[in-house]
């Protein structure tokens, strides 16, 4: 492949050199405190399921080697995605010489309902965490806490922004900071000592496969799922939200 082809067909180039296949990586960010790198892997509903066209070309699975009873190829659970039909996503943690030829990683979060056995929250007590699904963007505050915004929540709840401790005895503790309107996506968080800024994308969007109440009219311009931010009967609009702490205390402590 030429250098130009590598830039355009990056996933194919990665397969050729044996890169680790992941479940829809959406964002990546290094910790300003430790240098560890964190990646949000949103989900992969095809993992462990036969490909719709029997070709094996489902998501990150171009040449599946396993088949189901009907001979259809599928992508099985792997070490990097230890569950089949990964609906809720993962947060990957990498720590190594990033200029080296080899690296090491582990999973900080295996997202989903804490009551489910497959979920993992960095070793923290699962009875004391906020459920999180479909991590999309990641950011850090000045104290080294990871903040995760979500997109496409598969737990029948709205998307939101979550703070996650990555070091110390509270490692893996996940706290919901805010949620966005139904069918909207939380993205692009920016964390400061006294305020948090976040984007609210496509509020009012109709997603019938997720069971949102669309009635008999699937047109989001006439029957949106919300009227945020103006309310009433106004058209929903994307917006940037700023949450400000007014008591003088800092966010993330």
Predicted regions mapped to residue ranges:
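Sequence/structural signature of beta-propeller domains
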Residues: 1-253
């Amino acid at each position: 492949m030429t250098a130009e082809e590598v830039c355009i067909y990056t996933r194919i180039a990665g397969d050729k050199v044996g890169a680790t296949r992941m479940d829809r990586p959406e964002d990546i960010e290094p910790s300003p405190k430790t240098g560890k790198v964190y990646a949000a892997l949103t989900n992969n509903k095809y993992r462990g399921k036969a490909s719709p066209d029997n070709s094996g070309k489902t998501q990150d699975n171009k040449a599946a080697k396993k088949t189901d009873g009907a001979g259809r190829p599928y992508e099985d659970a792997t070490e990097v995605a230890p569950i089949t039909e990964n609906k809720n996503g993962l947060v990957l943690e990498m720590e190594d010489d990033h200029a080296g030829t080899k690296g090491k990683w582990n999973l900080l979060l295996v997202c989903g309902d804490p009551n489910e056995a497959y979920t993992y929250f960095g070793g923290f007590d699962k009875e004391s965490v906020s459920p999180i699904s479909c991590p999309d963007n990641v950011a850090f505050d000045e104290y080294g806490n990871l903040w995760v915004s979500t997109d496409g929540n598969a737990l029948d709840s709205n998307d939101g922004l979550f703070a996650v401790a990555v070091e110390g005895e509270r490692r893996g503790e996940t706290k919901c900071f805010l949620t966005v309107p139904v069918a909207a996506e939380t993205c692009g968080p920016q964390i400061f000592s006294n305020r948090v800024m976040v984007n609210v994308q496509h509020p009012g969007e109709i997603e019938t496969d997720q069971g949102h109440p669309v009635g008999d009219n699937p047109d989001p311009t006439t029957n949106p799922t919300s009227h945020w931010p103006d309310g009433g009967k106004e058209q929903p609009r994307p917006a940037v939200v700023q949450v400000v702490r007014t008591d003088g205390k800092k966010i993330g402590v």
